[in-house]
From Swiss-Prot:
One of its GO terms (cellular component) is cytosol. Keywords: Nucleotide-binding. NCBIfam families: PRK05412.1 (NF003819). GO terms for molecular function: nucleotide binding. This is Nucleotide-binding protein Dred_1927. CDD domains: YajQ_like. It comes from Desulforamulus reducens (strain ATCC BAA-1160 / DSM 100696 / MI-1) (Desulfotomaculum reducens). Belongs to the YajQ family. Nucleotide-binding protein. It holds the Pfam family DUF520. The lineage of its organism: Bacteria, Bacillati, Bacillota, Clostridia, Eubacteriales.
Amino acid sequence: MAKENSFDIVSRVDMQEVLNAVNQALREIETRFDFRGSKSRIIFENKPEITLISDDDFKLRNVIDILESKLIKRGINLKALRYGKVESAAGDTVRQVVTLVQGIEQDIAKKIVKAIKDSKVKVQASVQGDQVRVSGKNRDDLQLAINVVKGTELDIPVEFTNYRTI
């Protein structure tokens, strides 16, 4: 009986690490001199979005820089962030919503499957909901498939999980 090896390609963000990064960013905003008297704040309620509020575009850009630096330190890939439009909010402030990408969208999943099939590696790739399953007989072929995916230009961070031998 031949053994089948497989792994999953997923895109997910650790919400606890995002919460930690947001708390660190808020602490820095509270203590920084250039934010004294500012209405700048970050709102994160364990939904896959972060709301940034600040006095003006310049301070909003600084809030984004602080948040991004804290996310990087916590191991969150910035490709997982989708920035919305900057819009006016109440009290002469500006607001921007940042969405956290969870799961692989259909068009990106198809791009991953196509890249693997075009590489002529002897594996099968299939879309399963918001992840891609790659299976093959040889572990070396799976490693080649991982390298193909890493070499493909994607708009999202990907992880390789759930290695199995069936």
